[in-house]
Amino acid sequence: MAGLRQIAFYGKGGIGKSTTSQNTLAAMAYYFGKKILIVGCDPKADSTRLILHEKAQSTIMQLAAEVGTVEDLELEDVCKPGAGPFNPEQPSPSGGWIKCAESGGPEPGVGCAGRGVITAINFLEEEGAYSDELDFVSYDVLGDVVCGGFAMPIREGKAQEIYIVMSGEMMAMYAANNISRGILKYASSGGVRLAGLICNARMTDREYDLANALATKLGTQMIHFVPRHNIVQHAELRRMTVVEYAETSTQAEEYKELARKIVHNDLKVIPTPMNMDDLESLLMEFGIAEQFDEENVGKKAEA
């Protein structure tokens, strides 16, 4: 496991984190021959569906509830090979492949979903899922709530490289700044580092410049700007990644370039998160937010 790189994708809910991570990891396997284990750490259990061509993978916590305890599970019950060119038995021309596991969590409103992340990762480690043949383990983590459970890949030093999926929208930037705070908190004890921002474009005003400025403020890089394209949704409807669905498309080239940058990335930093005033000032600088005035609170836009 000496050469194993453990990375994590964090980001605000609904930002396209799982879609971006799966398309990027698919490109890493397909074009660059990387052997990857994806560990989904989102209660939605949607971190592997495009790789598996399935609606949703059965989760470790779900299967454990069916058989009694996690100890009653076998690794092959919860760790599934990718479909098509991502299957280890029939790997891509480059030799890359992907295996998938989803941590899952309790029923909505009951218990701690973050606890499922901890239980799942411990089980995978104990059962030998982190084999020597792997190049990458990737965690796909819910990023709105950086609670103890969801921060586990950061807190326990499981993931050394964090990629934050964001956009030029205020709440996505707010979440990115919050996640950076979590990384900073555990940087000294766990060795975790921020490896870059991935801007999953929403086509807002001056989005590229704003994302780049946020990256600079956080002391990192905008590792790639992923343009918006309908082909991503078309591929999703077939439960496929873009590199498999439309290999010659310009969007496949975007994910290939992002994959290349991650494979060769050596810029991993302790972030410098901003306070809320500085974040709002950044938005004002780029014309996204107006100069704040208490007298305007609750007032409608002028006609």
UniProtKB/Swiss-Prot annotation:
Name the source's superkingdom.
Bacteria
Which UniProt keywords are given for this protein, alphabetically ordered?
4Fe-4S, ADP-ribosylation, ATP-binding, Iron, Iron-sulfur, Metal-binding, Nitrogen fixation, Nucleotide-binding, Oxidoreductase
Q: What's an example of a GO molecular-function annotation for this chain?
A: nitrogenase activity
Q: Which parts of the sequence carry ADP-ribosylarginine? A: 115
Please list the cofactors this protein needs: [4Fe-4S] cluster
The record's cofactor note says: Binds 1 [4Fe-4S] cluster per dimer.
Q: Could you give a single Gene Ontology term from the biological process aspect?
A: nitrogen fixation
Keyword NADP among UniProt keywords: no
Which residues does the annotation say bind [4Fe-4S] cluster? Answer: 112, 147
The EC number on file is 1.18.6.1
Gene3D superfamilies the UniProt entry points to: P-loop containing nucleotide triphosphate hydrolases
Catalytic reaction annotation: N2 + 8 reduced [2Fe-2S]-[ferredoxin] + 16 ATP + 16 H2O = H2 + 8 oxidized [2Fe-2S]-[ferredoxin] + 2 NH4(+) + 16 ADP + 16 phosphate + 6 H(+)
Please name the InterPro entries in this protein's record.
NifH/chlL_CS, NifH/frxC, Nitrogenase_Fe_NifH, P-loop_NTPase
Task: Tell me what PTMs the record reports for this protein.
Answer: The reversible ADP-ribosylation of Arg-115 inactivates the nitrogenase reductase and regulates nitrogenase activity.
Q: Which HAMAP family does this one have?
A: NifH (MF_00533)
Family under the similarity heading: Belongs to the NifH/BchL/ChlL family.
Q: What does this protein do?
A: The key enzymatic reactions in nitrogen fixation are catalyzed by the nitrogenase complex, which has 2 components: the iron protein and the molybdenum-iron protein.
NCBIfam families the UniProt entry points to: nifH (TIGR01287)
The record describes its quaternary structure and partners as: Homodimer.
| UniProt name for this protein | Nitrogenase iron protein
Q: Which organism is it from?
A: Wolinella succinogenes (strain ATCC 29543 / DSM 1740 / CCUG 13145 / JCM 31913 / LMG 7466 / NCTC 11488 / FDC 602W) (Vibrio succinogenes)
